[in-house]
Amino acid sequence: MRDLRALPAAGRRGQPVRILAGDYNATLDHAHFRRVLSRGYADAADRAGMGLTPTWSSPGGRIRLTIDHVLVDRRCAVHRVRVHDLPGSDHRAVFADVRLP
């Protein structure tokens, strides 16, 4: 997460549009993650009304968390987010349909 603090702010006119995706090991309420969101990024699943869809489960499935994210520049429109099981992985893949500005 420290590396993410070095990201330039998003959503500014004239700046490139950025989409960041991956295993952040952070829920939407994680402090460092919130700082990234405050720099002009939005969680695609949250924008699509699916912000609490679990992407990771503990062995046995007792704990289910949303820790894999697609972050979009706030200028982007998110049309749909889907989460799919990945055979052999304890994480689920996150797919987002995004419209660039």
Predicted feature residues:
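His/acidic metal-ligating clusters that form di-metal
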Residues: M1-A21
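Short, well-ordered beta-strand micro-motif
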Residues: V70-V72, F95-R99
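A short C-terminal boundary segment appended to hydrolase-like catalytic domains
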Residues: P87, R99-P101
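Short, conserved phosphate/pyrophosphate- and ester-handling motifs at nucleotide-, phospho-/glycolipid
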Residues: H91
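Residue-level marker of positions within ordered structural domains that often coincide
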Residues: A9, C76, P101
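Active site of divalent-metal-dependent phosphoester/diester hydrolases
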Residues: R13-I19, N25-R82, L86-P87
